[in-house]
């Protein structure tokens, strides 16, 4: 079936219909797509779960989720349209025969079936088997899966093999929700539509790059999941490496899904290996202790409800990443991410090299670097720090740091920036895979991450403590300071 830019008529089947992901993210995003007129008039939304619900009961659950997790008041006209799309199928995913009930509800002739797995990856194999046995897996049916998939290369391959037994790669949409953020999408335009950056985006002009994804919250009651994953698997493998790829990739031949993803895979294959020989030099792992966050006292990681008091799981990671290719040789990428940090923010800062000759020593003995800051959240936008002459009659060139600032909300008069899930759901309905992660991307990322986590395990060093509400262990500052650089300060 040909791909179009219009959302096709779909049966969107949400496995895990009463779970957190569905209630917090998917349902509010579907409401916003309805509001924007982006849903095909014939699209239906079918919740799947073990609950003994009918259409009316599920409709009530959806309404409650929207009232709880949306910041705006529900428009009753929109609600009437959205609620008319809803239905529910009572189904245990481990009961393969029960999938025939789902099949009876679907309209495979006139609608594309999109199976959204809003459930743990351990269930994906059973779901795919049920769909396959019920003959619900033929093209153009699609499956949507949340990253991270597995906790290592081996477990990721196992999950992908289970899915691949019933669905071809062109049917599989692996979500990394950071790829749906407007500011991440803008990286392609910023880099490849502007000659200012197209011609100045390599080791000739760039000194280093910093990528920070900071969270104010702790583990939010997710001890069971997080303690097995840790910040490395949960955030570095899952989100920060994708951002790094978008910053470091070479220009694709076009904007097709495979052209973009081919270039990202090249970056991942060029990442210099970190193993036991250099892991202490290149990485810092930390774990938050009791402190103050969001204006209140909070417990340390080992004091959280359900905690294993001897856990060595990291809640903070800082890494120096080197890319061994012609474009980036000699340009370090510094990544850091953690929980219980002072603020919630995600940003990329690109530092440009200073001029070879300083003509303004009377004003600045050492010229500061120009830097491009890409604010992914909050206050989405881009700013460039430059030096300008201070106006005046003084014969000296008094220079001052100023910023050229593009704020998305102000520049584009946007009161509502589409949530990442709105974009990704819509792209799934359109059949466009450019914002989704291909299997080889996932596996190359896991290869690189596995060598680090294996080195940590062999060293058996405890993560370095940092107080909740601070910017991580002192060692993370020392790591970048050794290179004569410093982390960007948040305003």
UniProtKB/Swiss-Prot annotation:
Coiled coil spans: none
GO cellular component: cytosol
Organism: Escherichia coli (strain K12)
Assembly and oligomerization: EDF binds to MazF; mutated EDF (sequence NNGNN) does not. In pull-down experiments interacts with CedA.
Pfam families: G6PD_C (PF02781), G6PD_N (PF00479)
UniProt protein name: Glucose-6-phosphate 1-dehydrogenase
Disulfide cross-links: none
UniProt keyword Oxidoreductase, yes or no: yes
EC numbers for this chain: 1.1.1.49
Protein family membership: Belongs to the glucose-6-phosphate dehydrogenase family.
Catalytic activity as recorded in UniProt: D-glucose 6-phosphate + NADP(+) = 6-phospho-D-glucono-1,5-lactone + NADPH + H(+)
Annotated NADP(+) binding sites: 50, 92-93, 147
Keyword set includes Signal: no
Binding-site residues for substrate, renumbered to this chain: 177, 181, 215, 234, 339, 344
Active site: 239
Post-translational modification: Probably processed by the ClpPX protease to generate the extracellular death factor (EDF). It is thought that processing produces Asn-Asn-Trp-Asp-Asn which is amidated to generate Asn-Asn-Trp-Asn-Asn.
